[in-house]
Amino acid sequence: MSGFQNIGRIPELKRRIIMTFALLAVYRIGVHIPTPGIDGNALAALFQRARGTLLGFFDMFAGGGLERLSVFALGIMPYISASIILQLLTVVVPTLERLSKEGEAGRRKITQYTRYGTVVISLIQGFGIAVGLEQMGRGAEAVVYSPGWSFRIFTMITLCAGTSFLMWLGEQITEKGIGNGISLIIFSGIVARMPQAIGYTGSMVSAGEMNWFVVVLLTLLIFVVITFIVFMETSQRRIPVQYAKKVVGRRIYGGQSTHLPLKLNTAGVIPPIFASSIIMFPATIANFIPFAGMKTFAKLLTPGSIIHELLYIGFIVFFCFFYTAIVFNPDNVADNMKKYGGYIPGIRPGKKTSEYIERVLSRITLVGAIYISFVCVLPTILIQRFNAPFYFGGTALLIVVGVGLDTIQQIESHLILRHYDGLVKKSSKMKGRR
């Protein structure tokens, strides 16, 4: 409990946490503000029939906003899609590659391009959803009160504005709050919907659609998956590093042994989020286009189908390696070690050290990619088999646990920086000082 008590003793940290909760509360309020021109009851009936389909999976990332067609119906996924496109383009477009190497000014420019891309993608998805809703249901089952271009344009602009506001909200959380704002928005949407998912599971048991044995089995599965995620997310490959002794006057500096910690999952929760975004973008549009071929295409990409899971695994593996290459540069690490007199025993400083770190990183990234694929795919298939909500699937659990651990680590960094105990005491030697 002392770790939580210490939070209140640091005004800046306390302010950041309050700011984070306040901004997330704004997001959750916005999820309940409906887009005008929609029959809420007809839309609810539509999503009741769509449980277990791609729409249900998309709604999980939208925090329930799509089910209500709220102003935040698109969620933060258009921003993530734009981020993916920009990060891929920085590899192949020389101008963007130069910008990415220009420090803070270059990053600000790329962020601005990402915002423009978010607006474009939001407009496309918003228009597709508006057209699709007009086609879903006729007469008494009509979802839209007054179909036509006025509704399409108004809905497109409303949903685009909602996503743009969420993008700004996420940036504010990252800058003025605690944790990664975009990840926390997805995290809060999933967590906020879990009580409803539990209630839905209970109603299935009451209706005889699911027995208690299956509920107990799913509960055990969730517990095992969470434990496994925590273990893997905190696992490291430690490379020993030795620093050479330096004699300055009568003093001896250096000579200590330490290690270079490489996380098993360096990319964090980014790969499954990026993979989901890529699959959902075309599939969501197809789901709302009233043609038989498009409906078949959308059905093929429904979570649990072979095509979806193969694509999902492929994208997860790709983004594990791609994002790790972005956030961790072996050349920079090797140069810094050489600069300060550090070396890996048995490995020559400089290029050889960089190559060695890259080999180790590639091996553990492959293990991390297999782990994420296993966690995201296998539980989802089992849960689909028993018709349980997506909020109990591997992707949702990985995001909740991963983002939670990352946020706790950031809080601990603030505490340790100011000589206080962290939230999790690692040993008796780590006691803080007031």
Tell me what each language-model feature is.
Residues 1-100, 105-434:
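N-terminal cationic and glycine-rich segments that engage phosphates or anionic surfaces
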